[in-house]
Amino acid sequence: PIVFFHTEFENKVGEHRLEVVFNKSGSAAGAVSENHFSSIGRACPAPVLNTVAEKADLQPLGHEAPSSRYPCQRFFYSGEEVYFNSGLPEFGQAANQVSYTILRAVGNLSRVRLLGRGGGAGPCLLTPEANCLGPQEVSYGWAPLALASLTEEPGFAGLDEPDAGARQLAEIYEGNLRGFWLPEGAEPAALEFLDRSLFEISDRRISFQAFYQAGPDNCLVLRLLNSSGQDLKLDIG
């Protein structure tokens, strides 16, 4: 159910931001993006993606100018659609459009003209390599959020909730992460375990983050994330 995009281009210009823009199938009040340890929702600030003229609007004294671009990890979703990326941590949103920043060309770490930021945004250093001149490749994806429920066999809870569905589709976009245990010094034949899952989580509102050994008895520790905001009970088998 996922559309995969792979874009190749040659950047010949410095000091700019290049985006890929999606027209949404319908308007939405905002977007929700995956961030560290949680998902964060943001209201839509404008009917269209910000233009230079809109960015130039003066802001009341003591008030921060609204941001037009936001951070994300693997995905964000808006309305009935979810958007994935491979290493593209910035997106934009409007009522009927969303965007991914696929290149930021930056020739200076900070400029002396930014006197309003006491000391600037950092040392005034030239960063010509950060203009990323030359051939570039980026990957990203799109899917209807409703199709998440078709990715699993019946019996798993939570896929009808947007955040759980988006996370499930993100796993498919990246390639499902499987946990498996190999004995020390295992022969290559042990790779047959790759087709088996070490455990299964019954509720897709709980996502698997990591597992490792810890403690004097080398117990197996599972790190899980509950992004639903609810108290949940689940079976791990």
Write out the residue ranges for each language-model feature.
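Terminal accessory/anchoring regions of large secretory-pathway or extracellular enzymes
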Residues: 1-237
